Amino acid sequence: MLEDKIYTLEEIRSLGIDTHEYVFMDQPGETTGTLVLKAESRTQSKRLFFSLSDGRKILTPVFWWQLSRGFQNIPTGTVLKLTYVQNSTGQIHLENAVPV
């Protein structure tokens, strides 16, 4: 299991952490998943990696305007009820993450 921290891009590369199986959520709704990894991105956002109860692996960006919601402070390994919503431009984003 990985440490409970936000990994830098360099750490992900140097540790050989493979994130290629993770994809963006493509539909709104609720699901249950375990937080596997937290990482920086090339922008001011963070990235959260979840293993969902149905076996999917989801990559979720947390944008600067979502940082106040504390998503990046959730401990790695936490099982969460995740709520994804679709915005007015059709993009899907994480609206809420509540420990189960």
Ranges and model annotations:
Residues 1-20:
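Transition segment at domain starts
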